[in-house]
Amino acid sequence: MAALLYLRRRAAAAALAGVAPKPQWLATAARRGALVSGDDGGETGERGKSPWLQLPPFAPLDAAAAARAISRGGGEGGDGEQGATAIKWVRRCCPDLPTSLVQKLFRLRKVKKNVVTAEISSADASAEQHRLRRVSAKDQLMPGDILFLPVNLKESSVAEKTKKFDNRNEINFLRGLEIYKDEAIIVVNKPPGMPVQGGVGIKNSIDVLASMFEENSSEAPRLVHRLDRDCSGILVLGRNQLSTSMLHAIFREKTADALADGTQHVLQRKYVALVIGTPRHPKGLLSAPLAKILLQDGKSERLTIRASSNAASVQDALTEYRVIESCPQGYTWLELFPRTGRKHQRFLEPQLLGITSMDGKRIRSGCLFPCHGQLMRNCSGKGSFPLGLLWVAEASLRSNLSFIYTASKWFFLMSQWLFIGCSLQTLILISQILRSSTLLLHCRCICG
């Protein structure tokens, strides 16, 4: 009784002072919001800090339909999804959380949903009061529903990220690759030699290091497409679940529609390649059936061009090409526009033209080692980038040509070419290429 009288007096004093009393539901939610690790307390220890991590409001948008409309240049993306369960929405918004942890959160009643209730005040005015209520894994969500998770999930993920990546030079190097960033996407200039996805023997890759592009965020950017390890160029990452789903669908839509019709789509891929030889026609369309064959070791695979596309394992590859410029020494700059996104498609495109590619380890006769000129201390021997990336410089003609690298913001000066002892034939080629004003338009595209 004494406690109840105290609460009434406190509420009356707050009303006289013009300050609204603290809602009881917030204190109750804080007490129930114990840490998943087993802590007893619910308060975070900082005044005014919410004990809950708020997920984006549930939006029943069909990402595939929206991406289809965007890729075709249309308008609305069609009807949305009929609905989603609470556990499905948590997995979409927090793909980095293990499935076992998500299920544990629902079992321990750590997942809440906002509930709006209407109460009648003393002035008979309608007032909305937001409350948090436990939600089960199979509960259906309505548009606008907001789910809440314990805030310690975000804090623990940020602490783990900071502990894992504490090398400031590596972090600065990665963030220096950033070209564009907004609320939905991040665009980076992937260096050569860095794999996009991890695997056996791969320590650092874009998908592992993606969290370094975010400051104090538990949601790391997600991959939506890939580039080959030896290829440099623009790589797009999604910053949230919705943008990632739509970008995934846009890339899939492009490949599927390229085989169905000749419709011009919003998404366009472009590569710039230095090749040996000159195509017969200045532009055209390449079409070839590609297939994988298993090598004798039983583990490795090789991509080959088949005579026909009747086999089930054969995939058609389509690429448009255009000659930028050629020189009398027999080298040509090419623009390649892949319509399909087949694995290692770009390595076989020059072979279809009867020429030899000057990049890629899969073509040993023209093996190059592209490198950023800004980071080179000398022009011979070997060196290294952060994160274990290597560059190699030799005195041969082909390795000198490897320095023709049009990364954004970085160009070699002619004096550096003279310093490394390039032959006259090489300098003629370089002067012809650098004299072309069209090359400046491709300063954000990389050879290959």
Swiss-Prot record:
Enumerate the active-site residues: 228
Q: Which reaction does it catalyse?
A: a uridine in RNA = a pseudouridine in RNA
Which domain of life does this protein belong to?
Eukaryota
What's any GO biological process attached to this entry?
enzyme-directed rRNA pseudouridine synthesis
Compartments (UniProt record): Mitochondrion
**InterPro entries recorded:** PsdUridine_synth_cat_dom_sf, PsdUridine_synth_RsuA/RluA, RluA_PseudoU_synthase
List GO molecular-function terms, semicolon-separated: pseudouridine synthase activity; RNA binding
Q: Where is the S4 RNA-binding domain?
A: 84-170
Q: Name the family.
A: Belongs to the pseudouridine synthase RluA family.
Q: What is this protein called?
A: RNA pseudouridine synthase 4, mitochondrial
Give the organism, scientific name: Oryza sativa subsp. japonica (Rice)
